[in-house]
């Protein structure tokens, strides 16, 4: 099923989010396409270490505007709780035919090797659980690791991923809060692109907070979209009634 592009007047109206002193703007331009994307949700990634929750990164997930009508077909009217607990809902976000963008901002310093090895480990686990790990994915993992090998990420720097509907994964880096106009590398592997996002917001994703934030914001946006659809259909029905 395809959806026509959303006009600027239909671009989702959302607020910025501040998560652990990191601010995510309500919209950004993708370094892969220059398309405007809206903030779907944001949260932290951390671990309990000796009884203390330590935050490593703060993550924001942006979506193309046609994600709202696309997801509304099946999910409008669902509550935040229903969406947050739904594996199929987040699979549909991961695999949907709309652009996604992920901004991962460091709270603690990480080397590129540390970050990329953990991400690819999670991706491989997802593929093996789905029975879809092939030589193509193994080569994509090698390229991913190579991109990050010499990098270091101090606090405040960001790793950026743009996922195109056709399946390419554009990688970019930022040393501050800015988003570069272009990426530094592109990996043409749809399963890797999807797995990077799924490793964050999927069933066993590393950021339950981001998952909940997306569920909450999309539940509201889909309800708003439904109200606008109903109003539009009502006005069409009225017009047809007058003509008849």
UniProtKB/Swiss-Prot annotation:
SUPFAM superfamilies: Chalcone isomerase (SSF54626). Its EC number is 5.5.1.6. The record marks 115 as: Important for catalytic activity. One of its GO terms (molecular function) is chalcone isomerase activity. One of its GO terms (biological process) is flavonoid biosynthetic process. It holds the Pfam family Chalcone. InterPro entries: CFI (IPR044164), Chalcone_isomerase (IPR016087), Chalcone_isomerase_3-sand (IPR016088), Chalcone_isomerase_bundle_sf (IPR016089), Chalcone_isomerase_sf (IPR036298). Pathway: Secondary metabolite biosynthesis; flavonoid biosynthesis. It catalyses: a chalcone = a flavanone. Substrate binds at residues 57, 122, 199. Keywords: Flavonoid biosynthesis, Isomerase. The keyword S-adenosyl-L-methionine does not apply. Transmembrane segments: none annotated. Catalyzes the intramolecular cyclization of bicyclic chalcones into tricyclic (S)-flavanones. Responsible for the isomerization of 4,2',4',6'-tetrahydroxychalcone (also termed chalcone) into naringenin. Belongs to the chalcone isomerase family. Part of the biosynthetic pathway for all classes of flavonoids, a large class of secondary plant metabolites, many of which are brightly colored. This is Chalcone--flavanone isomerase. The lineage of its organism: Eukaryota, Viridiplantae, Streptophyta, Embryophyta, Tracheophyta.
